[in-house]
């Protein structure tokens, strides 16, 4: 959220004068809510086997929450989705945003990315890939 706020401020747009149906958000995520997934699975495994998951499990886990929250905060109503393509996610978000503007589907796009899969599963998985 902070990175998107700073990008919007740095762009110098006067958002109140723009058509918010023509402003979109595309945000990259390498994996998504890995910490949420890991915690829910560990809590389930430690229990009695009864499937008890947090009702916010899915919304906290899916990568589309980030662009959705950015749009909600600023009232943007244009294209909105996340790209999930590992280490290329943010680059893909930038390319997609450029193309949305080029073909006329939006006038302004907020784009970027974020990731922090610093969990047991994330570190072990990347270690197994010899990517650390």
Name the predicted role of every residue range.
Residues 9-19, 27-132:
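Acyl-thioester C-C bond-transforming condensing/cleaving domain
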Residues 1, 24-28:
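Short, conserved beta-strand segments within well-ordered enzyme catalytic domains
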Residues 1-10:
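Conserved FAD-binding subdomain of flavin-dependent enzymes
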């Amino acid at each position: 959220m902070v990175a998107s706020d700073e990008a919007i401020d740095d762009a110098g747009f006067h958002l109140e004068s723009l058509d918010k149906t023509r402003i979109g958000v595309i945000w990259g995520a390498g994996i998504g809510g890995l910490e949420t997934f890991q915690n829910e699975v560990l809590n389930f495994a430690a229990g009695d086997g009864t499937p008890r998951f947090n009702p916010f499990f899915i919304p906290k886990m899916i990568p589309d929450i980030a662009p959705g929250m950015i749009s909600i905060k600023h009232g943007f109503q244009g294209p909105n989705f996340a790209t999930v393509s590992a280490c290329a996610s943010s680059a893909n978000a930038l390319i997609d945003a450029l193309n949305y503007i080029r073909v006329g589907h939006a006038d302004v796009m907020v784009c970027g990315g974020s990731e922090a899969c610093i969990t047991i599963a994330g570190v072990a998985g990347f270690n197994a890939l010899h990517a650390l």
